[in-house]
Amino acid sequence: AFLGFDAVSTAAQETKNPKRNMPIGILVSLLVCTVLYMVFAHVMTGVAHYTAFSGQQGIAPVAIAIEHMGQADAAGIIQPDYPWLNRAIVLSILFGYCSVIMVTLLGQSRVFLSMSHDGLLPPFFSHINEKFRTPARSNLLFMVLVGLLAAFVPARLAGEMTSIGTLMAFTLVCAAVLVVRRTMPDVPRSFKTPLVPLIPILGILTCLCMMLFLPADTWIRLVLWMLIGLDIYVGYGMKHSKLEHGGDTRHGQVALNMIGLILAVLCVITGLWHQQTVGWGENKVLLIISFVFAFTHCAYYMWRIWRK
């Protein structure tokens, strides 16, 4: 529900007086979304019992709520009073998705633009179109990738991956607040997170608690995705980064290798957890993939440690 409010920060370079306007935009958007979603949830659970929405995906909960706005026939089946309203709301939701996708793509292309400027990604992602003054190549690439994912990835899988990825990002942001506040206490800040370290710690615990309710196969994909990201950084970003903070120091290399080993161990743990959940006699594709990734990366980062 709250996915996307952080996309406001990606447009900081294109904002007038970002020190003042960015915190206002983020906090106001959070407040408005919180109120709207509370009202929406109240209406939905008022129309139908909350157990009726269990296990539903995508826009199905809205359709279920509308179907409950009717009278039961002789067979006990509810006949909707407003069947046309179901189709109208579904259509409006699809139109709403267009604006959400546009904002998400805008934010993602700006993130990759900044990473490319630092050297963490190839120059392809920092190319600016001379006519539109936007990262057009990145926008086109993400448009194709998102279209393929939307066409071929099940809604449940996409939703769970989005949820766990977003919660993981929020967890890292909260941890970064703790680290930066301690390591760079004298940096000028136009906006400071109040009640540090209480607020970041509560944020980390809340995100981790919500992540625990996601299925084990989602955790496997999260760890695999993080390993792939670490591979990109080790193979390209660390060598081309203009900041060069940590990559060339002994402590930075040790921390990098330890993160790789920890992720490899987590890959094994999540694979076993998933197989225990579905049963040892069921499909073992994810278990095999997790073990291959784990042992490959464990061997590689052990070799890096031995080489140093």
What are these regions (language model features)?
Residues 85-91, 95, 148-175, 188-192, ...:
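Transmembrane helix-loop boundary segments of multi-pass membrane transporters
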Residues 125-133, 170-221, 228-264:
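C-terminal membrane-solvent junction of multi-pass transporters and transport-like membrane proteins
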Residues 1-21, 25-26, 45-49, 109-118:
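Helix-loop junctions at the membrane interface of multi-pass solute transporters
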Residues 25-105, 120-161:
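TM-loop-TM module centered on a large, flexible mid-protein loop between adjacent transmembrane helices
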Residues 1-4, 13, 31-38, 91-104, ...:
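Hydrophobic alpha-helical transmembrane segments of multipass integral membrane proteins
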Residues 245-296:
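Charged/polar low-complexity intrinsically disordered segments, enriched in acidic residues
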Residues 25, 85-92, 98, 138, 231-239, 268-272, 295-306, ...:
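Alpha-helical transmembrane segments
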